[in-house]
């Protein structure tokens, strides 16, 4: 599932925030420019309940429609969460294979023990999800005040509301809007918003906590007994490091998804009224009660009277149905055809790859950028643990369209290995690229298993086909 931020994230009400006042809640102009677009994208991937809770924001009232009629109109509408499905597919492609990590033993045990701790994988999935959705995300390293292990914090685009740089281009100010549940009694929790300011004061990195625009706490993170000189935060987007002012990547999908939703509302509205035939009678008095049913008689006193059902005819609904199909096809194309139901028959592997190459180019760039960010973050952590600042190396897989090696190719590969045409390392490499190995296994484990089985086969062959023993001449006992 794609990451969905906690309550409040992405629900920016610009009118309620300070755009230009000089306080901790002031919004950066770039944040203001993108806020409504980001809110729309977040709502679309959050699903039907969130979309419908915004009522007329995404589904305007029809002309002359009262509240009761609009409520029925809204309830009948169907929001097809294609945006969420697209994001889910993108994240699934990016996280199909686990990363390869080399790091000092203690760091491997603390942060990259994927058998017992999936925190790193969850962080990676969230980073891909946020950048693929909003074209912006942030991450920084945090050190607990109690002296525990350092950890990374991933922030969605909506959380960082203001920032500034020093003369060297490094961050000198980052303001984070934090939504959290505050304990007000033993049983009661209250949802509140506070601000965390990451800044440089007197040459040192500090965090200032604000509640209701009042600073309530200052924290100075210490590493190896010394304060940091830079803010350990990295901003990144779909094309590299830094803060982008470009629209969210899923904005086009979100716009068509909402248009699809409005067309669905009109179609269901029309079906509701046209799908229920209305009985009418002409040429008869309306003074008496009339009944419909096989056990009742209807008497029409006038010879010209007539009774019938008024039913819908025409092409009005067909045009709405066609519009839905067209918009769904547009969504499928924009979301890399992941939802395309077109019948193309059985395509060769190379044909499938070529058809998707351009569509995965953006995802490849996103993953490569995140790869750089993760190495930056975990090498900051490594340095704080007295390790070399380049002792951690994380490699994320970008072969999203890799297909499984066929049985024929695998047999030919093993024959080449047995015949001496390829060495063992080449064999293992091709088996791994061809997705014929357990992703949890290491190359050393696979090598040991192949050699073990090779020896077992050789021993079994010796037993089935024993080598003939040479005839030893028997001593001549008759000679003295």
Regions found by a protein language model. Give the residues of each.
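C-terminal helix-loop subdomains that flank or include functional centers
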Residues: 326-480
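Amphipathic alpha-helix face/heptad-repeat signature
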Residues: 127-131, 256, 320-323, 327, ...
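A structural detector for beta-sheet-dominated domains
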Residues: 15, 20, 35-37, 142, ...
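Extended, charged amphipathic alpha-helical segments
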Residues: 218-349
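Extended, regular secondary-structure scaffolds
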Residues: 128, 132-239
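Short, charged/polar micro-motifs that form catalytic or ligand-binding hotspots
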Residues: 129, 250, 310, 314-322, ...
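Extended, helix-rich architectural segments
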Residues: 1-152, 462-480
């Amino acid at each position: 599932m794609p990451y969905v931020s906690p309550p409040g994230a992405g629900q920016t009400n610009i009118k309620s925030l300070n755009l230009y006042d000089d306080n901790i809640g002031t919004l950066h102009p770039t944040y203001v420019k993108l806020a409504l677009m980001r809110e729309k994208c977040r709502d679309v991937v959050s699903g039907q309940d969130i979309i419908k809770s915004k009522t007329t924001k995404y589904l305007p009232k029809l002309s002359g429609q009262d509240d009761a009629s609009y409520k029925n109109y809204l309830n009948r509408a169907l929001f097809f969460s294609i945006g969420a499905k697209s994001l889910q597919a993108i994240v699934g492609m990016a996280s199909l294979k686990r990363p390869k990590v080399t790091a000092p033993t203690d760091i491997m045990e603390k942060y990259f023990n994927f058998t017992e701790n999936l925190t790193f994988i969850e962080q990676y999935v969230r980073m891909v999800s946020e950048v693929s959705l909003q074209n912006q995300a942030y991450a920084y390293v945090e050190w607990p005040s109690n002296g525990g292990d350092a950890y990374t914090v991933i922030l969605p685009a909506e959380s960082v509301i203001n920032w500034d740089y020093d003369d060297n281009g490094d961050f000198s100010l980052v303001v984070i809007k934090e939504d959290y549940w505050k304990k007000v009694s033993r049983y009661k929790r209250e949802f509140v918003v506070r601000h965390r300011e990451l800044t440089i004061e007197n040459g040192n990195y500090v965090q200032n906590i604000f509640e209701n625009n009042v600073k309530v706490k200052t924290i100075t993170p210490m590493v190896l007994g010394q304060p940091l000189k830079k803010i350990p935060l990295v901003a990144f987007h779909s094309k590299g490091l830094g803060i982008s002012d470009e629209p969210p990547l899923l904005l086009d999908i979100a716009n068509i998804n909402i248009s699809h939703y409005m067309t669905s509302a009109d179609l269901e509205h029309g079906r509701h009224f046209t799908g229920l035939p209305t009985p009418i009678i002409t040429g008869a008095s309306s003074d008496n009660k009339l009944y419909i049913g096989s056990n009742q008689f209807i008497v029409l006193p006038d010879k010209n009277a007539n009774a019938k059902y008024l039913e819908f005819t025409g092409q009005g609904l067909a045009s709405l149905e066609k519009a839905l199909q067209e918009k769904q096809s547009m969504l499928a194309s924009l979301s890399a055809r992941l939802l395309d139901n077109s019948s193309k028959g059985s395509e060769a592997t190379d044909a499938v790859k070529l058809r998707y190459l351009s569509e995965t180019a953006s995802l490849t760039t996103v993953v490569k950028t995140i790869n750089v960010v993760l190495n930056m973050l975990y090498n900051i952590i490594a340095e704080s643990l007295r390790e070399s600042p380049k002792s951690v190396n994380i490699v994320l897989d970008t072969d999203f369209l890799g297909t499984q090696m066929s049985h024929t190719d695998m047999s030919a590969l093993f024959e080449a290995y047995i015949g001496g045409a390829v060495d063992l390392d080449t064999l293992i490499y091709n088996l791994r690229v061809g997705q014929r190995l357990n992703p949890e296994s290491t190359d050393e484990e696979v090598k040991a298993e192949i050699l073990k089985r090779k020896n077992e086969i050789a021993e079994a062959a010796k037993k089935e086909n024993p080598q003939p023993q040479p005839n030893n001449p028997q001593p001549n006992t008759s000679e003295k």
